């Protein structure tokens, strides 16, 4: 069978990134000098998650176009200034300071990789610049720097802890799960997920028999998997980016060890199925924020952005980027200003209802809750026949609100 994706990831990244930069340049040229400046700081070319960053930018720019067509925000246009952080924390920190101090942006979107957000979240908090996360899902990203401190980190996207609560509820409910093994990558994303896995497993009283780690660029995880196998793990919880999850599946195939695989939403990334292959890709189950059973309005937006994103699976990040931009614009209008403090306060008490593409938002944030999407907004997902599909079985059907502990 030919590969699912013909161009290489690098070729896709180079072509897509050039298009994003060109689009950003066109937006700059279309608006006046007093445009409201927004920034994007995230990986667009380097890591397995870069396609998610590119898709988010497409969604953000689509929202900017629609706001312009509707008359602008406070009578002004918006400019998106894009910075590729190459998945490198030092570069991401540099980008953040540049966007705020030199470009004068009033808000920042991103990053793609959770570890980078954790590396620089003190910067926007110190400088009072709201951040609208729409890709990175580490639980700690939206936590305040200290108890009761003003918090400028918001998110419209998935949250690791929410996913972990759900997949471990599935494991606890599944009669075939008796012994669980954890397998996580050593990045900030992987280890943030591990922290959630360990905490929620303890709360739910689950039997964890192995806890192994691997590097994000590893291609052979048979040593770690043999330790899970020797411990009798019948279920593996894998927390990693798309490509390494695919390598885990290939490593399982090498030793003919196929436990139940519950994993992070990074398995929806095209890099996962390209690494695993179509057959092995069908084994894990995971959660996403956008169902493959799209409603007519979502389908219309999908048709609009699909030519600009790498794959169908990246659509959810365009949705997150679009909805996050619209919520930010609502806050700016409500505040009648672009001042960071006033915009943060408006976000925490948004008036009115916004019908987004992920959900209908009604007072989505508060002073202490900065997540736009919650447990009720998650969708069980798998791969079938080389395409994402809704997943359901007797365990999913039997899950009840009281099962989601943590």
Where are these regions (language model features)?
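Extracytosolic ligand-binding ectodomains
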Residues: 2-15, 31-406
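Hydrophobic helical h-region of N-terminal Sec-dependent signal peptides
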Residues: 17-21
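C-terminal segment of classical bacterial N-terminal signal peptides
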Residues: 22-29
């Amino acid at each position: 069978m030919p590969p699912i994706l013909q161009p290489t990831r690098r070729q896709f990244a180079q072509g897509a990134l050039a298009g994003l930069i060109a689009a950003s340049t066109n937006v700059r040229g279309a608006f006046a000098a007093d445009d409201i400046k927004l920034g994007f700081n995230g990986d667009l070319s380097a890591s397995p998650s870069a396609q998610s960053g590119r898709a988010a930018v497409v969604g953000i720019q689509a929202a900017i176009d629609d706001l312009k067509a509707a008359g602008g925000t406070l009578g002004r246009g918006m400019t998106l200034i894009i910075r590729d952080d190459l998945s490198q924390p030092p570069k991401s920190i540099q980008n953040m300071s540049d966007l705020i101090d030199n470009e004068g942006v009033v808000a920042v979107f991103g990053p793609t990789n959770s570890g980078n957000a954790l590396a620089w979240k003190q910067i926007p908090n110190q400088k009072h610049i709201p951040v609208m996360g729409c890709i990175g899902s580490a639980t700690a990203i939206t936590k305040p720097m200290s108890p009761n401190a003003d918090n400028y980190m918001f998110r419209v996207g998935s949250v690791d802890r929410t996913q972990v609560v759900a997949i471990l509820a599935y494991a606890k409910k599944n009669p075939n799960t008796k012994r669980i093994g954890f397998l996580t990558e050593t990045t900030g994303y992987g280890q943030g997920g591990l922290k959630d896995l360990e905490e929620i497993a303890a709360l739910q009283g689950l039997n964890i028999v192995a806890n192994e780690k691997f590097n994000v660029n590893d291609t052979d995880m048979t040593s770690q998997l043999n330790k899970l196998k020797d411990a009798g793990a019948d279920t593996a919880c894998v927390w990693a980016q798309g490509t390494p999850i695919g390598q885990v599946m290939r490593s399982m195939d090498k030793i003919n060890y196929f436990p139940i695989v519950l994993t992070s939403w990074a398995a929806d990334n095209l890099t996962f199925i390209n690494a695993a292959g179509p057959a092995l890709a069908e084994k894990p189950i995971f959660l996403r924020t956008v169902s493959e059973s799209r409603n007519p309005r979502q389908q219309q937006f999908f048709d609009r952005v699909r030519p600009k994103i790498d794959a169908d699976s990246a659509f959810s990040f365009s949705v997150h980027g679009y909805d996050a931009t619209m919520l930010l614009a609502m806050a700016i209008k409500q505040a009648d200003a672009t001042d960071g403090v006033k915009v943060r306060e408006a976000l925490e008490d948004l008036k009115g209802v916004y019908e987004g593409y992920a959900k209908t938002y009604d007072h989505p944030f508060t002073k202490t809750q900065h997540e736009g999407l919650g447990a009720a907004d998650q969708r069980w997902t798998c791969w079938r026949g080389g395409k994402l599909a809704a997943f359901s079985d007797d365990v999913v059907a039997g899950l009840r609100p009281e099962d989601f502990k943590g």
